[in-house]
């Protein structure tokens, strides 16, 4: 098990692009490999990280019960707030240590030891993005950097890598460097201005994102 003690799975979104499936269930509970997207995510994380926290919003009561049954340590209701609200407004804001952050629609295989080693090598920045090579059919935020210091993030200009939805961040340090951000994009740009946003040289061993029912069906044909 890595020395990273905390992970956050962001799972509060409505999953509009997966309607009508998400009319009755929240997106994180979409069926995957005999279980659900978020149950598999929690199970994988639990092999490496002892404390797993989940943000919920849409159909929050249903999802909260599900993730607690799956072993989540705590649940934060962020309904009506931005995706980075929890960084500034929950007990996690005081953590002065690396926290692994993922989104519920990422299916990923990570080498946590390598990732943590890379974070230490970069002098434990306020935030380190974990990138992937662009995948055809999946939109993303392209990352531009100079010696791993991020200089720009763009959805228009293309680069060799884009955000995977995975990052390692230090909540207390972010609160010291930034004012409360409207979303992660705003948070990142505040960090860029301070020279405090880094990008990892370690990529996920396997990675896929689920934005549509078609992508979910495709992933279920060859799960990992």
Q: For each of these PLM feature ranges, what is it?
A:
Residues 29, 142-145, 200:
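A structural signal for short hydrophobic beta-strand segments in well-ordered beta-sheet cores
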Residues 1-9, 17, 31, 35-114:
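Conserved N-terminal catalytic core of the sugar/cofactor nucleotidyltransferase
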Residues 100, 107, 116-120, 134-135, ...:
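Catalytic-core segments of class I nucleotidyltransferases/pyrophosphorylases
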Residues 55-57, 75-78, 129, 153, ...:
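Conserved beta-strand termini and adjacent loop/short-helix elements that scaffold enzyme active sites
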Residues 65-69, 140-150:
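Acidic-glycine-rich active-site phosphate/pyrophosphate-binding loop
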Residues 14-20:
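Short acidic/His/Gly/Ser-rich catalytic and metal-binding motifs that mark active-site loops
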Residues 23-28:
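Short alpha-helical oligomerization interface
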Residues 122-132:
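A short, conserved acidic/glycine-rich loop-to-beta-strand motif
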